[in-house]
Each structure stands twice: as structure tokens, then as C-alpha cells.
Swiss-Prot record:
This is Actin-like protein 53D. Its main location: cytoplasm. GO terms for cellular component: actin cytoskeleton; fusome. It comes from Drosophila melanogaster (Fruit fly). One of its GO terms (biological process) is spermatid development. It comes from the Eukaryota.
């Protein structure tokens, strides 16, 4: 694929999906993101004049992941919300460098979590216009974009990434905020839980670098059980994972015990709803006339919904809670890890969307509060 994009091409734009764990970026109207990298900023663990001159003050993304042994890794986004704007700015700068794009050349569409605080949206708008000097800007709700990626405008999105899980009912392209449920349990919590389960086996994975290895183990070997109690009795099939230093870790029931927390958060000591319960709660909070459509259009989205068997277990557990006559359909696209980005690319390329952009003139006239008027 060419590394260039024609800025004069029809409705070209930069699309950036800011995930808590992974940043996905590329150009509209392309189908897949060109840059996918960890949303991490690494800083040297120990002050070392020689080392500092070699790797600089901070390292972003893949480079930070590669040098994790000598770095302390930080995530600028926690539970879907930006917590450190200076580091977030570094991640965006790195994004444009990877895309080999000048921010001043193309409009930028960024994503946000549902129920994102107003001040966060304003800060994002301010940075994009003031620091990056983009010609036009828009911020869209992640779950809505996931729904667009499936060609729907009505349905409920169960979006679980690294930092947060949301169940978001959407009607005619608009999220219904009163029925959204946010659960602060997602991929990062499952990684921590797997660290704890490995500790029970006598394997200590405590540093931020070792946690990244555990995340890789989780993504490669874990799966969702259809019958947790029964499989616990059978202890699960054993798999071996080889660490970079050659040491081998044996995993048995940990492989399904880890993602089980999505359905039974009490395993983590959390008093929150499982993903099937949160979905049921969201649908129940919708208008009676919408519920049938919601049950028939459930869309799984985000990296933490990529576990094998998750859609079958989800359907099984939700069916037990739903009215007996209701038809439930769960959409689990193989590309759902990138569905937010894909939906953003689709939206930014629509002719009908072009008058939705906030342009620099509007920003100069109104300021960052313009984002509430044009992005909802």
C-alpha cells in the first residue's frame, strides 16, 4: 500500500481512534487503519546520562513496548478518559509521524467514550486546533461508529476495550445517554487478574514490562467457557507459553478463569454487572417500543470481545435474562477490534457528513465550546 494519501481525494480525512490500550489511525475512506500501536508512553526507569541520550526523554507506542525492560510504561488514557494531556499530545504527534501526514493538510476525526466529560471534549478540540492546527475537526462516540461499521443505525453496542466497557443503545445514529451503562472492567483488569492467577502458580509478573507479556499471553491463549463450573471440574486443557528469556509458563484453567470475570465480576472482587447483565439493564432502560430492535441488533466491539466463544456465551447468558419470546441476535464481526475506526472512516467519507465538520473559522469565533454544538 502506498504511504501517501491524496489530500484532494474525495472526502479524505485523518481518523484516529484513541483507545485506552491501543491507538488505531489511518485515512478515510480506507477500510482498515494504517497505524495500530500501544497507547503507551515510556520513560527511563533510572536516570542515566548515556541512556537518556540514546532513547530520549520519552518513547511512544511500539518503541516503548520493545524497550519495556528499561522503561516505566504509562497509559495517558485510563478507563476510556484522557488523564494526562501532555502525554496524549505526544501520542497524537507520534500518530501523525507514523502516518507521514501533516495535521494542517486534512480534517481530523477523533473518537471519544460515551458520557465523556464536557471539559475533555473541549480540551481535545483546543489541542487539535491550537497545537496541530487542523483545518477541520470532529469527535464521534466510539460505540456509534462501531454500529455504523456494521451498516446499522439502530442497535446496542457492547464495546469492551482495554480500559472500560460500555453498553450503548443507539437509535437513528444517536446514543441514548440515559440507557448507557459504563462498567470499569475491561482488558487491563483481565490482564491484572491473569497476573494474580499466575502468581498462584508461583509465577511473578509484577513490573509494567512483565504485565505486557501477560497481556500477550491473555490475547493468545485465553478463551470463554460455555459452562464455567463444569470446566473448572475438568481443569481445562493445558497450554505452554514461552517467555522471551526461554522460561516456559504452563496454563490450564487460568485460560478460561481470566475472561470469566467479564460475566462474573465478583471474581475480581468487583460489585458491578457482567456484560450480559449490563446489556439487559441498558435495553430495559430503553423505551418499550425500541427493545425488540435492540435485542435483534446487538453488536460486540473492541479488543476485549475477541476471546474465542464469547458471542456464544453472551447469547446463552442474555437469553436466560430476556423475555422468553424475544429474538436475540449477536453480531461479532471478525474485524471488531477495529470496528470503531472503520465506522469513523465510513462516517468521514459520507457526502452528507461534510457540513458537520467544525472548521477553524468556527473554532476562532466560538472557541472549544463549539464541540458541544456540532458533535453529539
Amino acid at each position: 500500500m502506498s504511504s501517501e494519501v491524496d489530500s484532494n481525494s474525495h472526502h479524505a480525512a485523518v481518523v484516529i481512534d484513541n483507545g485506552s490500550g491501543v491507538c488505531k489511525a489511518g485515512f478515510s475512506p480506507e477500510d482498515t487503519p494504517r497505524a495500530v500501536f500501544p497507547s503507551i508512553v515510556g520513560r527511563p526507569r533510572h536516570l542515566n546520562v548515556l541512556l537518556d541520550s540514546v532513547i530520549g526523554d520519552s518513547v511512544i507506542g511500539e518503541a516503548a513496548a520493545r524497550k519495556r525492560g528499561i522503561l516505566t510504561l504509562k497509559y495517558p488514557i485510563e478507563h476510556g478518559m484522557v488523564k494526562n494531556w501532555d502525554e496524549m499530545e505526544m501520542v497524537w504527534q507520534h500518530t501523525y509521524e507514523l502516518l507521514r501526514a501533516d495535521p494542517m493538510d486534512l480534517p481530523a476525526l477523533l473518537t471519544e467514550a460515551p458520557l465523556n466529560p464536557k471539559k475533555n471534549r473541549e480540551k481535545m478540540t483546543e489541542i487539535m486546533f491550537e497545537h496541530f492546527q487542523v483545518p477541520a475537526f470532529y469527535v464521534a462516540v466510539q460505540a456509534v461508529l462501531s454500529l455504523y461499521a456494521t451498516g446499522r443505525t439502530v442497535g446496542i453496542v457492547v464495546d469492551s476495550g482495554d480500559g472500560v466497557t460500555h453498553t450503548v443503545p443507539i437509535y437513528e445514529g444517536f446514543a441514548l445517554p440515559h440507557a448507557c451503562v459504563r462498567v470499569d472492567l475491561a482488558g487491563r483488569d483481565l490482564t491484572d487478574y491473569l497476573c494474580k492467577l499466575l502468581l498462584e502458580r508461583g509465577v511473578t509478573m509484577g513490573t509494567s514490562a512483565e504485565r505486557e507479556i501477560v497481556r500477550e499471553i491473555k490475547e493468545k491463549l485465553c478463551y470463554v467457557s460455555m459452562n464455567y463450573a463444569k470446566e473448572m471440574d475438568l481443569h481445562g486443557k493445558v497450554e505452554t507459553y514461552e517467555l522471551p528469556d526461554g522460561q516456559k509458563i504452563v496454563l490450564g484453567c487460568e485460560r478460561f478463569r481470566c475472561p470469566e470475570a467479564l460475566f462474573q465480576p465478583s471474581l475480581l472482587g468487583q460489585e458491578v454487572m457482567g456484560i450480559h447483565e449490563a446489556t439487559h439493564h441498558s435495553i430495559t432502560n430503553c423505551d418499550m417500543d425500541l427493545r425488540k430492535d435492540m435485542y435483534a441488533n446487538i453488536v460486540l466491539s473492541g479488543g476485549t470481545t475477541m476471546f474465542r466463544n464469547i458471542e456464544h456465551r453472551f447469547l446463552q447468558d442474555l437469553t436466560e435474562m430476556a423475555p422468553p419470546s424475544i429474538r436475540i441476535k449477536v453480531n461479532a464481526s471478525p474485524d471488531r477490534r477495529f470496528s470503531v475506526w472503520t465506522g469513523g472512516s465510513v462516517l468521514a467519507s459520507l457526502t452528507s457528513f461534510q457540513n458537520m465538520w467544525i472548521d477553524s473559522l468556527e473554532y476562532e469565533e466560538v472557541g472549544s465550546a463549539i464541540v458541544h454544538r456540532k458533535c453529539f
